[in-house]
Amino acid sequence: MARHDPNPFADEEINPFANHTSVPPASNSYLKPLPPEPYDRGATVDIPLDSGNDLRAKEMELQAKENELKRKEQELKRREDAIARTGVVIEEKNWPEFFPLIHHDIPNEIPIHLQKIQYVAFTTLLGLVGCLLWNIVAVTVAWIKGEGPTIWLLSIIYFLAGVPGAYVLWYRPLYRATRTDSALKFGAFFFFYVFHIAFCGFAAVAPPVIFQGKSLTGFLPAIELLTTNAAVGIMYFIGAGFFCIETLLNIWVIQQVYAYFRGSGKAAEMKREATKSTLMRAL
């Protein structure tokens, strides 16, 4: 017969002092300690420590340099102000880069609408250099072939006088005219550029005026030399072609500059300035 349980919801009576289960014995395993970190007693860290006197000396040295820079800056500013008051512009030579001879900075100094004209004018200046150099070469060959040393000396004179003369007389006035928009500078350019065009046209033809025209590589001496020495005649024809191209570029430049000169009202301004200067001289 089954045992009767008076209260099925009552907790079971357990004797805490009774030995119900056996506890497994503890193992003999243990945690191994970490190895000690290496310690280098001889390792040192060098920390530069300046003495108070050294710091003061360096501070005084830096202060002296700063004062010197301020003094130089003030002196430079004073000179720039004095130059600005007198209207003198210092032009640093920067062209050509390998051996600067002139000041030339079209992108930064010439207005954008005049840069094309200025570049083509500069091309005509370089073109004149090339024409006169080729003229020296061709005339030298003609001299070797028996034409005499006089024409060679004249070709050297053309180059030595023509290149710097062109820069001083018409290219620099045009450069300054486009940079400052000066009517008088434009007038100087027009006056001397007309002579430049006339010389290039004369050289392209080279009529027998000076030593039968053989000191210049023009068409007329080229035709004459072609019958006696074909190589020299061809060189003269090439030189004549160079002078023709130079003349055409010169005509384009003076037309463009004159169109700007008239369109901007500089012609009337130039007349007023010329009249004013004439009256001042008369007074």
Swiss-Prot record:
Cellular component, GO annotation: plasma membrane; transport vesicle membrane
Gene: SCAMP2
Name listed for the protein in its UniProt record: Secretory carrier-associated membrane protein 2
Cytoplasmic side: 1-123, 255-283
Mode of membrane association: Multi-pass membrane protein
Principal location: membrane
Native source species: Arabidopsis thaliana
Annotated keywords: Cell membrane, Coiled coil, Cytoplasmic vesicle, Membrane, Transmembrane, Transmembrane helix, Transport
Subcellular location: Cell membrane; Cytoplasmic vesicle, Secretory vesicle membrane
Compositional bias per record (Polar residues), positions renumbered to this chain: 18-30
Stated family: Belongs to the SCAMP family.
Intrachain S-S bonds: none
